[in-house]
């Protein structure tokens, strides 16, 4: 049975969906004003893995990941670029999809844009106003009154006094409490008309937190199974989502909360000021996308993930071992036999709070067994279980020879194969010095030759 670490209760719990056999999951997505960075990559890959495992476990999943396409940063960036909000956000949504596709991330079932749900947000704000949980501040913003929601702070495990003392919160004019947060931002004269919507409280735009409450309830209902996101969103974003949704609807918002850990770079926090900020595109210029996905999945999703070139290179070499086993022992197919002992250990790992670190260890056990036994069935298990994680779907030669998935051999392979043939002729003629010279020449160019029962094959070092 699947168990999930629930951030709300701070313990691992048996997963029981609201509707038997069906799961509804919402994940906070990207604010699209720039290219996605490594933190975004982790969120995308982690919850893609969660979605894949839920479906592999037989659940009928509805997966929603939103897009924030209206925000202070977006307005500022569009002004800097001299382009419309829609032009800017469309461009970065397309870039986000390109990055996600490269990382093997399947599209969610729904990918709502905040600007498409403004009416639903206004309806939710109106409900909060009717219940006395929201008020119009002196600057004409509509704010949520946290002191009116008795459970505020329960999610982050802090009292209101502790939160006021220890957290940096957005301050709006004439708030009743420093922790009160904006539901509706009154229009500013220096902002473009495309970010202004008519409302009962005057022209303006939604605050960040109300977006997710409105989109999730519209697509998944007032209560659903799983809500995910990065650890940085626990407070204030998810605390505020709970206050909004439970305040408006009067009952539990989400049953299981999941948060992935932070990404660090060379053991330091990733930030532009430290000069260690990397976009997904920066990393993919140097490493195969499947290596990046594998690197993310080697760690448990709740653990900190420390990025470095050395760690990515280690991931590349490890993934090479798995693909080498598939190349050496051609699998009969990629169907998983879930009654086989390795598959049972894989399932146990994944059912233990999506423990991909242990699941990946099972893949290496299978690779070692395939290399020892030459069993096509074992190789099929390896390929099939890897596929559950979104790995090992390519032809081994494509990965081992350094080509991207679907990328054709651009002629380099022909030249290398020609040298392999010359080496074979030299060996046949017992000119071992020439054979060794060819091997050394290729190795100097980063090409490793491996003699197998099926002939000589090559891969990148």
From Swiss-Prot:
GO terms for biological process: cysteinyl-tRNA aminoacylation. It comes from the Bacteria. Its main location: cytoplasm. Keywords: Aminoacyl-tRNA synthetase, ATP-binding, Cytoplasm, Ligase, Metal-binding, Nucleotide-binding, Protein biosynthesis, Zinc. Disulfide bonds: none annotated. GO terms for cellular component: cytosol. Zn(2+) binds at residues 28, 212, 237, 241. Its cofactor is Zn(2+). Pfam families: CysS_C (PF23493), DALR_2 (PF09190), tRNA-synt_1e (PF01406). It is found in: Cytoplasm. GO terms for molecular function: ATP binding; cysteine-tRNA ligase activity; zinc ion binding. It is an enzyme of class 6 (ligase). A motif ('KMSKS' region) lies at residues 269-273. InterPro entries: Cys-tRNA-ligase, Cys-tRNA-synt_Ia_DALR, Cys-tRNA/MSH_ligase, CysS_C, Rossmann-like_a/b/a_fold, tRNA-synt_1_cat_dom, tRNAsynth_Ia_anticodon-bd. ATP binds at residue 272. It catalyses: tRNA(Cys) + L-cysteine + ATP = L-cysteinyl-tRNA(Cys) + AMP + diphosphate. The keyword ATP-binding applies. Its EC number is 6.1.1.16. Binds 1 zinc ion per subunit. A motif ('HIGH' region) lies at residues 30-40. NCBIfam families: cysS (TIGR00435). Belongs to the class-I aminoacyl-tRNA synthetase family. Monomer. This is Cysteine--tRNA ligase.
């Amino acid at each position: 049975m699947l168990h999930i670490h629930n951030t709300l209760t701070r313990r691992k719990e048996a997963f029981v969906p609201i509707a038997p056999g069906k799961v509804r999951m919402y994940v906070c997505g990207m604010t699209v004003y720039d290219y996605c960075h490594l933190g975004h990559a982790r969120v995308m890959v982690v919850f893609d893995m969660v979605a894949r495992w839920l479906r592999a476990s037989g659940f009928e999943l509805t997966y929603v990941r939103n897009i924030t396409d209206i925000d202070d940063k977006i307005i500022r960036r569009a002004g800097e670029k001299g382009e419309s909000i829609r032009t800017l956000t469309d461009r970065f949504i397309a870039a986000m999809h390109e990055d996600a596709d490269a990382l093997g991330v399947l599209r969610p079932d729904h990918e709502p844009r905040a600007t498409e749900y403004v009416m639903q947000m206004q309806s939710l704000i109106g409900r909060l106003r009717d219940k006395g949980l929201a008020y119009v501040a002196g600057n004409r913003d509509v704010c949520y009154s946290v002191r009116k929601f008795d459970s505020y702070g329960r999610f982050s495990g802090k009292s209101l006094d502790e939160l006021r003392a220890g957290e940096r919160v957005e301050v709006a004019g004439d708030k009743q409490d420093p922790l009160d947060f904006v539901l509706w931002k009154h229009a500013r004269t220096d902002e473009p008309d495309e970010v202004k919507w008519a409302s009962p409280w005057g022209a303006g735009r939604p605050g960040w937190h109300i977006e997710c409450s409105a989109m999730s309830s519209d697509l998944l209902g007032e209560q659903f199974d799983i809500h995910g996101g990065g650890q940085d969103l626990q407070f204030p974003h998810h605390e505020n989502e709970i206050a909004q949704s439970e305040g408006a609807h009067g009952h539990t918002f989400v049953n299981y909360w999941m948060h992935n850990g932070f990404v660090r770079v060379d053991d330091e926090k990733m930030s532009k000021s430290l000069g260690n900020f990397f976009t997904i595109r920066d990393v993919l210029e140097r490493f195969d996308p499947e290596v990046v996905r594998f690197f993310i999945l080697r760690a448990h999703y709740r653990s900190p993930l420390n990025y470095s070139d050395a760690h990515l290179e280690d991931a590349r070499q490890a993934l090479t071992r798995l693909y080498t086993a598939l190349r050496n022992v051609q699998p009969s197919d990629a169907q998983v036999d879930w009654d086989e002992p390795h598959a049972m250990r894989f399932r146990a790992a994944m059912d233990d709070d999506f423990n991909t670190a242990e699941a990946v260890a099972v893949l290496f056990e299978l690779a070692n067994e395939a290399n020892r036994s030459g069993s096509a069935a074992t190789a099929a298990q390896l390929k099939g279980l890897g596929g559950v994680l979104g790995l090992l779907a390519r032809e081994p030669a494509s990965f081992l020879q350094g080509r991207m998935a679907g990328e054709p051999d651009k002629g380099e392979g022909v030249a290398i194969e020609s040298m392999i043939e010359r080496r074979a002729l030299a060996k046949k003629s017992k000119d071992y010095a020439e054979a060794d010279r060819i091997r050394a020449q290729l190795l100097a160019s980063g090409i490793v030759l491996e003699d197998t029962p099926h002939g000589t094959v090559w891969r990148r070092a």
